[in-house]
Amino acid sequence: MNTSDSEEDSYNERSALVQSESPTVPSYNQDNAMSLPQDTDSKRSGAVRSRSASGSGDAGPVDRERADTPDGEEEELTLKYGAKHVIMLFIPVTLCMVVVVATIKSVSFYTEKSGQRLIYTPFEEDPNSVGQRLLNSVLNTLVMISVIVFMTIILVLLYKYRCYKFIHGWLILSSLMLLFWFSFMYLGEVFKTYNVAMDYPTLLMIIWNFGVVGMICIHWKGPLRLQQAYLIVISALMALIFIKYLPEWSAWVILGAISIYDLIAVLCPKGPLRMLVETAQERNEPIFPALIYSSAMVWMVGMADSNNPDSAGERRRSGGGVRTQEGVESEHDAPQAGRRQYSAEEDLEEDRGVKLGLGDFIFYSVLVGKAAATGGDWNTTLACFVAILIGLCLTLLLLAIFKKALPALPISITFGLVFYFSTDNLVRPFMDSLAAHQYYI
């Protein structure tokens, strides 16, 4: 296989949100879509071709492993990598939900109802009238979904007309608010809860360092683990804001509606998120790392300079961490390529990076946090937690079957809602009755 064939195959057969260098697409609700890497030659999800740094087209370690593996053992190889992808997603999702639940259980600020509401939920719920409360929750959901659809369309138009600087500025402003203002609120309430004395200059210095490092890691360059940690933290902070300011019934209806919208936006031929995916595939552009959690490094350096021919090679190198432009490199590019030398194993791991939208982290945590805040029972909270992980496993299973970008919310949120209401209305009364009569099963 020569260089041109390898490049043509990887361009024509790449999937949305697949590899670190492959384009994935931003969305307003931070793209509730996820995907696994797939083989660029055989379209199997088991192994991925690793291109050499010189662009010679030699087979990578996984290709050699597959070549030496009988057909009967390919399924075992696929399952091995599939299990690794499950673990790579379970750990960050679990950490995000644990942070939210621990905060809900310890900091009363996020469970107290102050009467304030988000601008997206203008209708007040009346607890004395079930019908009116249900109607207002549905109206709040319609307003919320309408805002999401409108902002997604704006994002599609901006991306279609290559307004990358505007999108990047939009994301930077959002990150600034989360990393500075919301973090300041969070630390202040935590210090009040645990009676930690701290003066404002010291607190501001902590917030400043925390926010600046986060902005650099998310929007420029930084260690992979640190970038992942910041993405988990901002997802947890956003989920806590939703838990505090969303009305109770509106929150449950919004969770169900956002799952349906996610299904339509990703899978419909004219869905906005699918259009974004297809546009990014055609342009061969990287994703905005502020919108997704990636198990492989994603950098956004020089994306706005799309007309510069040298920027394409630079994006290829920075997107995968080890990628260099295929073919003959100029003397100007050679020192830059030599600055980042990684082994083939690290290259393979970054190619096989799993990506999950931050919106999925947020709404998973909202569901578990609402269960912990309203139910107050650990059985209900753990049931929702297990339901979300089961739904995530099934989504990954479907991903391995269909080999294309899939919405990550519908299955997990549906299972979570079913487990919550069944546990809260059936299991908890049953357990309380057993405890009251001192029955042991």
Swiss-Prot record:
Annotated intramembrane regions: 407-427
Stretches the record annotates as Disordered: 1-74, 308-346
Major place of residence: endoplasmic reticulum
Catalytic site: D262, D360
MF annotations from Gene Ontology: aspartic endopeptidase activity, intramembrane cleaving
UniProt keyword Transmembrane helix, yes or no: yes
Position of sequence motif PAL: 407-409
Pfam families referenced in this protein's UniProt entry, alphabetically: Presenilin
Lumenal side: 107-137, 187-199, 247-248, 377-381
InterPro entries, A to Z: Peptidase_A22A (IPR001108), Preselin/SPP (IPR006639), Presenilin_C (IPR042524)
One record GO biological process: protein processing
Membrane-spanning segments: 86-106, 138-158, 166-186, 200-220, 226-246, 249-269, 356-376, 382-402
Record membrane topology: Multi-pass membrane protein
Enzyme class: hydrolase
Start-end of Low complexity biased regions: 45-60
Bias kind Polar residues: ranges: 17-39
Biased composition (Acidic residues): 1-10
Task performed by this protein: Probable catalytic subunit of the gamma-secretase complex, an endoprotease complex that catalyzes the intramembrane cleavage of integral membrane proteins such as Notch receptors.
Protein name, UniProt field: Presenilin-2
Encoding gene per record: psen2
